[in-house]
Amino acid sequence: MTTVTLRGVPITFPFEPYDIQKEYMEKVLECLQNQTNGVLESPTGTGKTLSLLCSTLAWLQLKKDQLRVQRQMVGNLNENEFTAEFWKAKDLTEKQMNSRSMSGLPTIIYASRTHSQLSQAMQELKRTAYSNMKACVLGSRDQLCTLPELAKETGTYKNQMCQLKVLTRSCHLYNRVEKKKDDPDITGVNIMDIEDIVKLGNLHKFCPFYMAKELKQQADIVFMPYNYLLDPVIRKVMAIQLSDAVVILDEAHNVEKICEESASLQIKSSDVTLAIEEVTAIMKMMANESLSFDDSPKDFDPDQLCNLKQFFLDLEKEIDKIELKSGPEGTTLEGTYIFELFGKAGVTAENFYSVTGLIANIVQFLSTVSEGPFARKGNNLRMFEDIIKVIFLGTSDEFRQKVNKCYKLHVTEEEVKKRRSDWLSKATAKSGGKVLNYWCFSPGFGMNMLMASGMRSLILTSGTLAPLKPLISELEVNVGVRLENPHIVTDDQVCVKIVTAGPDSEPLNCSYYNRENIKYISSLGRSILNLTRVIPNGLLIFFPSYPIMLKCQQHWQECGLWSDINAQKAIYVEPRDKDSFNSAMTNYYEKVNDPNLKGAIFMGVCRGKVSEGLDFADANGRAVIITGLPYPPLKDPRVILKKRYLDVCNATDREFLRGDEWYSLEASRAVNQAIGRVIRHKDDYGAILLLDARFNNAKIKGQMSLWLRNRIKHVPNFGELMRDLRMFFKKADADFGSLQRRPSSAAPSAEFEVPKTYKGDKFNFSTSSIASSSSESLSNNGEVTIHKRLQPSHQHASKRMKINLIPNVATHSNVNNTTTKEYIIMVKKSLDESSFKNFTLALKVYKDTGNVTTLTESLETIFRSKSHLKYLIPGLESYVKVQHKAEFSDYCKQNGLLD
């Protein structure tokens, strides 16, 4: 570990940080010390997450130390020097003094897009000097509820049943939270991610969901998904306190869209009809005394049900009155019309609280009905409870003025669907129904409500935020600190080419008017076929959209190009469903890492799962091909209205983008994000190939990430491209492919696992290790969690390592010096369940037979596909009998595991 002092704050870092990491941490500290907001861009692979965590927690640690000194000074004063406040403070218990509300210590809130990204950040935290800090993560009941009878339930029904059981104290797991929250077995775990708290919950029989809410009260840093912060309804439900908090939005390139969507909603005529039928059915049940319906506790009466039904009937009538223009484009109304619409139905700013309260009581009651037509229902009523809360987020004239500026109500005809098998007695689908889209076009609308909570600082950070000015203008946040960092890699590690024509000289242009051109599609396919012959290992190909990707796939299969490409590299296509996606990703990694093959191709779409959240370091992504610019659908009503909104804003404030500038930037940002899947650390290298002539436009080039702009080169013909790529990969392999990672003072890659050596047909490349068990590689939300690369062996030997490229004494001593318990835990964490069972069986057989040859043969079988974990084998020496130690040592030396 190394300690650097920046802006008066000592920061313990796993290695000597690079200059760009120091600059990044200085900007973070500037935000925290000056209580201002920051927008910080640093490319993927520059150690952004590590720098963010270390600088933030170092600042918090200093605040803690200062507070501790102040307490000691208070304790040393004589009686006459105490004020009444000091006496009061002195009488507080240690627990009270440590509470964040009493201590005045700010809480760090770290939010990212997905739980897999949060999990990666928490694993990063565990490997720092700040692993003694208290950290927890907030998740949904789907992730954290372990009650057996609700195990198979999801979504709204699970939430309702949980709330009911808590209310009636019929959940034995919830009832133990209060008792167990101060248990040393719980409080003794500093960093608790979702897996940790679920395991502890199962062990100690408490509810992980409610325990997480308790733990956040004392946590130094709380991890949570974006929507927990940006959705006002969820934020209130989760009781997230933002006063004096430091809020970090990592991977914030999507924050504008998320803010808009959190403040938007949709109402269908069929939703209103279903709500009417839900209320009607309850009224009928209450009138039927034979069902003993009145025996159940209720917080509503028949008159209230009648009033609620009348509201929905009136709302249905008012929606039906809205006239639609002829054609599919629909009708656009001012945003404030939503207040008029609900007002005519009887819900206003003055009474909406009572309406939402009534709906909540009804929904809660329906949760108690476990059988019959009401079981598991009330979903539409619950939806309207949330809708009304969003509509009436504010009630002042100023709020309505903002709605008038930032919102539009777009109404279209509802598609008539076949009636599904439903619990309701009558058909809900009807002709002439409408869809009301209440769209927010200002990210600042939601962000302002967040900022109004009194937070200390807001830090937005990502690898792709630029240009910063329009982002800041749209979010309407006062930003005091800005940063656009360069990349950590050199020009020899990146080859960026714009390709305007294929090998047959056919122009490559995936514009709306050319994407159906068979000549273009064929030329694109031939371009990819040729490139697979010079690009080693893993190749990513991103298309602007699913339809375009499927169109290309279909044509290439018909003309034989698909089979030709597949003969070079196995092709995998990004599916839309979770299970198929996980399977495709697992197979792709296996093919890339198979030394008998030439690699693999993964075809995906910009803004898809692959382009947003995954790490294709080293051989997993030696090149990325972008086949076109992913512009939003030009004729989409929401896109049209967004462009108009921005044009109006730009007319009065030039800091705002014009509509067409935003439209272009949407495509460029998606491309930048897709490109960020490769070049993941300081020793990585790869090619970025832009196969669309439009990339040669100066405006588009100017919207690419800062670290790419000066590296972009246009190649006039395909032959020159092939020659340049051969030379690039040959030189990069010589300079970086077999790089030995020994302990040194140089800074390693901050974010990902150490790669193993991959030997292909022509090259000897580095490729990141992939766990053989899909259960370790796949996250619950459909994202693939690539195991993050630990600090390479530049770190001190005391740092836990999963793999070393060149085994060395320091690493082996680290394994050998562990206790028996620690060693077994280390092996269990590294191996999948099946391999660990085989491992323990091999030890048992050796213990029973004393045959060391059988032991080494078993180890060879277990670790054959896990060569990156063979460093664990020498740790078995303490288990080997004295008479076998020499033979075991020889085995380790022969396999390069001991010097």
Task: Please place each PLM-identified region on the residue numbering.
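Conserved pre-motif I regulatory segment
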Residues: 1-41, 51-54
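A substrate-engagement module of RecA-like helicase motors
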Residues: 2-15, 19, 60-222, 227-230, ...
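A contiguous, basic/glycine-rich beta-loop/short-helix subdomain that forms a polymer-engagement track
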Residues: 194-219, 230-239, 352-506, 522, ...
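SF2 helicase catalytic motif II
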Residues: 241-269, 273
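Conserved interdomain hinge at the start of the Helicase C-terminal
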Residues: 449, 507-544
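Conserved RecA-like P-loop NTPase helicase motor core
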Residues: 502-519, 572-698
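Conserved helicase motor "Helicase C" RecA-like lobe of SF1/SF2 P-loop NTPases
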Residues: 546-575
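Acidic, Ser/Pro/Thr-rich low-complexity regulatory regions
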Residues: 741-899
